[in-house]
Amino acid sequence: MGTVREYEGQMALSWKKQSAYGTAVTNTDLIQALRMTAFPDADFKPDMVNDEEVFGKGHEWATEQNIERFNTALKTDFDLTSHSAAFLFAFLFGNVVSTQLEESDAYSHVFTPMAIATTKQLPVTSMVQQLSSGFKKLLRDMALNEVSLSCSVKDRAKITGSWIGSGFYGDSALATMPQLITSPYLKSDNLQFKLGTKASEVDRSTDLTNLDFSFSNDALGDEGYRFDGDGYRRECEIGKRKMTLKFGLRLAHDSDAEHDRLFAQTALSVIMDFVSPVMVDETYPHSVKIEIPNLAYTATPIKVDGKVVGHDIETLPMYDETLEGAVQVTVVNDVPEDTYLAASV
């Protein structure tokens, strides 16, 4: 029958979270599949210990090797869509409020980082990776450590998630792999980029050249092992969360506003609103909006892109008293309320 090709692979996902760490999402809830832009290579690499350095053997060679701990990691790469963004931000932030929009077929999902006073355990989900009829693996207890989103005027917007699992990587009994979801792409020309003081942001979309956003949970992977854990991670908690935002702006002839904002440490707000021309229904389009209501510049170096002069701007996102956080993401799509982060039972 020959060997397996990369393009034969499929991945089953779920919008739902596991009911508990160590309890997989049920097969009836593993019904989602998203278009990925790169092969999702599951890194299953147990920590090994051998006796190569042990004294007294009379030679330099190892005579035994044992698995001490299990570990899994996975990277998922997507074009930015309302479905890929909602899936990743749900498990990245761990908190969502969803509402139906005026009896339409559209739903608004507002994602914010969960309050660590309530829980520090990241929500976890399960995935199934099928590479052939003889290779179908369940990845259990997958927590999302980091999401990065990038966009330039020349390319589609991309979004990537970096996952960390318990180390469980076993055979799956999922009978049928799901079909890919049809989801409109959110491109660079779908982005409205607003920048300015809070509530007075100005559209700078025509000046924007590139955009890089990331949010990390600093997941405490090594701290998740226990004496009674038989080598598997038993929890995955938040460490010290960190967010970055960098973007490029063309330099105007009549203004040095970005340098002025750096030296004055002006409190600024950024709204990045990707709005698709494809509608969920007659009223509401697919969209992803990222709001950072309080930030300051940390650097505004000059750059030359081709023949055009601009700024490469680096920022420090900060806590906002009104939001009671530092970032909020709103996604509009056709996924009903009470779906994202619902417990699989």
Predicted feature residues:
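Signature of extracytoplasmic/envelope-associated structural regions
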Residues: 1-345
